[in-house]
Amino acid sequence: MPIHSALWSSAIDTAQSLKARLAIIHLVHEARGLDVNPATIEKFRRAGDLESVKVLEIIHLDEITHVTCGHRWFTWICEKEGIDPVETFRKEVREKFNGAVKGPFNEADRAKAGMGREFYEDLVGEADVRAKLGVGYESAAIS
């Protein structure tokens, strides 16, 4: 399952930084759940699988809580360090995430979680490009 692979890869890539972990795991991956869950719920509803709809609705509400907590802690850390949360989030994503932060976005549920559009619009992670170019990484000698 590619989504789980991406989640675990991001967990490894952000292991050394709480800010990066909160930004990438909670405010990118889990926020993406806010975007895709409503369409998934609707597909199950159209198929008549109301039991799955109920479960997915609970999961969706839980996802809003995860993003809210991630946003709260990320913002708190940034305030303690005297840095701008939006600029810091965008920097963390550019440096430690691979690929675009994809829409369409569920702006209403992202806003409920505290994430305004300034966080995620027109944002692309460059981690894979940086790794391939060796930018920001120590070169390792191969024996």
Protein language model annotation of sequence segments:
Residues 1-143:
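Non-heme di-metal
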